[in-house]
Amino acid sequence: MSFERLQRDLHEAIEGVNRYNPENVAELAACVQAMVAENKYDKDIVLTILKLYQLNPERYDENVVRQVLLKTLMVLPSSDFALAKCLIDTNRIGSQELRRIFDLGAVLESCNFAVFWKLMKGTYKPTTNPNEPFKVPAEISKMIKPMAGFEDAIKHYACRVISVTFQNIEKKLLSSLLGGASDKEVTALAKKFGWETKENGEVFFVANHEGTIKTRNIDEKIQFSHVADLLTSNVPPLAF
């Protein structure tokens, strides 16, 4: 069954008091599988199945949890990955497979795209540090391979980060941050994000961040009842 069909049926099934009906677990898991295969995403569904696993530990399926975590990484910089981690019980998070995803998430959340692409391309060299998170780097690319659209999603995430951190960026550096993307792909992404070419196309103008700074006025409404006791108290004011 297609993702759209499963999604429609599930949103009807998990509405209101039926949201955490354990009988929905099988259909939710099938929908997650469809998300992976068809490169789709539904935040409500992935968070609902994690909550159901918390409430019904006997139905827990780590394979589905891994897929959910990887899908939430594909929508960075949203907070879905952080939310998903919070819905996994502490007695589960020590799993080697889950730790591997958490370590990958830490790399992406810190915008360390150089390490990510090395892991994807098989060029990452593990350190001798006992706490080295990627002792077997090949496991990362193997884990991600079934996730349709994962690398493209990370490229778009990198572009969003670039949009808020760079004013100008060289094409060579941009290509590197996008995993060695071709000139054609770099140009297409630059156009999509509204970056202009400069210096014969070797540099992209991203944004004039200094010219787009917006001030914010913060108003706080204080009710009279909140300060009435202070105004009527006999405590003398502090001397400076």
From Swiss-Prot:
InterPro entries: ARM-type_fold (IPR016024), CSN8_PSD8_EIF3K (IPR033464), eIF3k (IPR009374), PCI_dom (IPR000717), Transl_init_fac_sub12_N_euk (IPR016020), WH-like_DNA-bd_sf (IPR036388), WH_DNA-bd_sf (IPR036390). Gene3D superfamilies: ARM repeat, domain 1 (1.25.40.250), Winged helix-like DNA-binding domain superfamily/Winged helix DNA-binding domain (1.10.10.10). Its main location: cytoplasm. Keywords: Cytoplasm, Initiation factor, Protein biosynthesis. The keyword Glycosyltransferase does not apply. GO terms for biological process: formation of cytoplasmic translation initiation complex; positive regulation of apoptotic process; regulation of translational initiation. SUPFAM superfamilies: ARM repeat (SSF48371), Winged helix' DNA-binding domain (SSF46785). Signal peptide: none annotated. Residues 41-221 form the PCI domain. It is found in: Cytoplasm. GO terms for cellular component: eukaryotic 43S preinitiation complex; eukaryotic 48S preinitiation complex; eukaryotic translation initiation factor 3 complex. One of its GO terms (molecular function) is translation initiation factor activity. The keyword Nucleotide-binding does not apply. It comes from the Eukaryota. Coiled coil: none annotated. Component of the eukaryotic translation initiation factor 3 (eIF-3) complex. Component of the eukaryotic translation initiation factor 3 (eIF-3) complex, which is involved in protein synthesis of a specialized repertoire of mRNAs and, together with other initiation factors, stimulates binding of mRNA and methionyl-tRNAi to the 40S ribosome. The eIF-3 complex specifically targets and initiates translation of a subset of mRNAs involved in cell proliferation. Belongs to the eIF-3 subunit K family. HAMAP family: eIF3k (MF_03010). This is Eukaryotic translation initiation factor 3 subunit K. It comes from Caenorhabditis briggsae. The lineage of its organism: Eukaryota, Metazoa, Ecdysozoa, Nematoda, Chromadorea. The gene is eif-3.K.
